[in-house]
Swiss-Prot record:
Residues that span the membrane, as ranges: none
NCBIfam families, per database record: rRNA maturation RNase YbeY
Entry-linked SUPFAM superfamilies: Metalloproteases ('zincins'), catalytic domain (SSF55486)
Subcellular location: Cytoplasm
Protein name: Endoribonuclease YbeY
InterPro entries membership: MetalPrtase_cat_dom_sf_prd, YbeY, YbeY_CS
Species annotation: Rickettsia peacockii (strain Rustic)
GO CC terms of this entry: cytoplasm
Cofactor note: Binds 1 zinc ion.
Function in brief: Single strand-specific metallo-endoribonuclease involved in late-stage 70S ribosome quality control and in maturation of the 3' terminus of the 16S rRNA.
GO terms classed as biological process: rRNA processing
Primary location group: cytoplasm
Length: 167
């Protein structure tokens, strides 16, 4: 079971009714089912903040020391590494609950990027959601090898949902 908490701090998000708990749960479940190590955990929780440029700028400055609005920020609850998920999950014990983390999305940046890249707002959001969840479970793109692995997984998941790959 996946519990999703959504906080909408910016009214423009309400125009996108298809961005809801059901969509976020479906995508999260699709990602987690790709990793056998998550099968022991019965309940996952994910917190989503749908906000604006001013708030994301504050968060980006506070947590990354970058004074710029960004499309999305991911805050993992656990220090997971996709290459060693089994031992990391064993370390967490026999808990049947895991809070994956928090994700903050910025409406204005996502809107501008989707226009510039000729994508629908929703498809761009889905791509960023997939990208962020992968960060929460230990994926990164600090070097070319990691970036290729993460991008290929994103492409595979996007294709499953009928979305053309952005790369």
């Amino acid at each position: 079971m996946i519990n999703v908490e959504i906080v909408r701090n910016y009214n423009k998000w309400r125009e996108h009714k298809q961005i809801n708990k059901s969509l976020i749960k479906k995508i999260t479940q699709n990602i987690l089912l790709r990793f056998d190590n998550f099968s022991k955990i019965k309940q996952f929780e994910l917190s989503i903040l749908l906000t604006n440029a001013a708030e994301i700028l504050t968060l980006n400055k506070q947590f990354r020391n970058i004074e710029k609005a960004t499309n999305v920020l991911s805050f993992p609850s656990n220090e997971l590494n996709w290459q060693d998920l089994y031992s990391k999950l064993e370390f967490l014990g026999d808990s049947d609950y895991m809070h994956l983390g928090d994700i903050a999305f910025c409406y204005e940046v996502i809107y501008n990027e989707s226009c510039e890249q000729h994508k629908t707002f929703e498809n761009h959001f889905i791509h960023l959601l997939i990208h962020s969840i992968l960060h929460l479970i230990g994926f990164d793109h600090q070097n070319d090898t990691e970036a290729n692995i993460m991008e290929n997984l994103e492409i595979e998941i996007l294709s499953y949902f009928g979305i053309f790959p952005p790369y």
